[in-house]
């Protein structure tokens, strides 16, 4: 991976706020604390990783027109219950680390918003929480995920159109399936556990849920799909896109890339009249 964001926000922070100390005005951060400086300059911090991945996903045509979203749980930090979420309505290729919403699990309490950050950085823009937030939270609470990705991949949308009357997408006997985890529900722990990786002969099954006028209204359907498909690491949303999660941000990235590859291939197979599942 290259340095996050491919921009100079870290240097700008050092130049502009190197002597800042923490203070509040009417409950808002009025100057940038040393802690926030360190956070925004750490290339492996979740806020910076979201920026890096947003730019990569934008280049892949997955999050254009402010669509899509990414969230990362700080699994390696002092508080693994903290979740960083990209805001709603921002251009993903220009997103900055200080634009994230910070939510704490399990009570979903908002710890920090971009509106708490000094206006020198945010230019007085009024940020809104991502409409994907309740869906991201569902992935964290139901699957103990470390990251959740939502894209508007055209391959995902096209495949749900090919399967207009179907409730799931299936494909088998494709090498790329090996990149995805083999999951199983543990009756004793009542949790989904990874028992290895999928194999060439395995059949990948991803549930499809129906789209709704508002993103947050997808929550119940997403939760139902997660419950009914314990072996899935993703949920397709018809005529909309896909949600993908993983135990870490890098696993989620790999799963998303592998699934998108399989969806693109599946679209071509459909057009060529080739069955997606080999008997």
UniProtKB/Swiss-Prot annotation:
Pathway, according to UniProt?
A: Amino-acid biosynthesis; L-methionine biosynthesis via salvage pathway; L-methionine from S-methyl-5-thio-alpha-D-ribose 1-phosphate: step 2/6
Taxonomic lineage from the root: Eukaryota, Fungi, Dikarya, Ascomycota, Saccharomycotina
Which biological process, per GO, is one annotated for this protein? L-methionine salvage from methylthioadenosine
Q: Give the binding site residues for substrate.
A: 132
Q: Which Pfam families match?
A: Aldolase_II
Cofactor binding comment, as recorded? Binds 1 zinc ion per subunit.
State the needed cofactors, names only: Zn(2+)
What protein name is recorded for this chain? Methylthioribulose-1-phosphate dehydratase
List the source organism.
Candida tropicalis (strain ATCC MYA-3404 / T1)
Q: Which residues form the active site?
A: 175
């Amino acid at each position: 991976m290259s340095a996050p964001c491919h921009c100079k926000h870290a240097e700008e922070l050092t130049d502009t706020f190197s002597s800042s100390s923490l203070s509040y005005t009417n409950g808002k951060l009025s100057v940038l604390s040393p802690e926030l400086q360190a956070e925004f300059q750490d290339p492996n911090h979740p806020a910076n990783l979201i920026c890096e991945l947003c730019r990569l996903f934008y280049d892949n045509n997955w999050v254009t027109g402010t669509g899509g979203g990414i969230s990362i749980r700080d699994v390696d930090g002092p508080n693994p219950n903290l979740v960083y979420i990209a805001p709603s309505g921002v251009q993903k290729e220009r997103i900055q680390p200080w634009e994230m919403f910070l939510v704490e699990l399990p009570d979903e309490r908002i710890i920090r918003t971009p509106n708490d950050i000094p206006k020198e950085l945010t230019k007085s823009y009024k940020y809104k929480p991502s409409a994907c937030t309740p869906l991201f939270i569902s992935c964290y609470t139901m699957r103990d995920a470390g990251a959740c990705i939502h894209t508007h991949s055209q391959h995902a949308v096209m495949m749900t159109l090919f399967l207009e009357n179907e409730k799931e997408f299936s494909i088998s006997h494709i090498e790329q399936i090996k990149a995805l985890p083999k999951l199983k529900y543990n009756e004793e722990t009542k949790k989904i556990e990874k028992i290895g990786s999928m194999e060439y002969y395995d059949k990948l099954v991803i549930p499809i849920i129906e789209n709704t006028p508002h993103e947050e209204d997808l929550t119940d359907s997403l939760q139902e799909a997660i419950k009914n498909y314990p072996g899935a690491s993703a949920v397709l949303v018809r005529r909309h896109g896909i949600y993908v999660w993983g135990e870490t941000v890098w696993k989620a990235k790999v799963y998303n890339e592998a699934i998108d590859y399989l969806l693109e291939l599946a679209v071509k197979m459909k057009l060529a009249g080739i069955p997606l599942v080999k008997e």
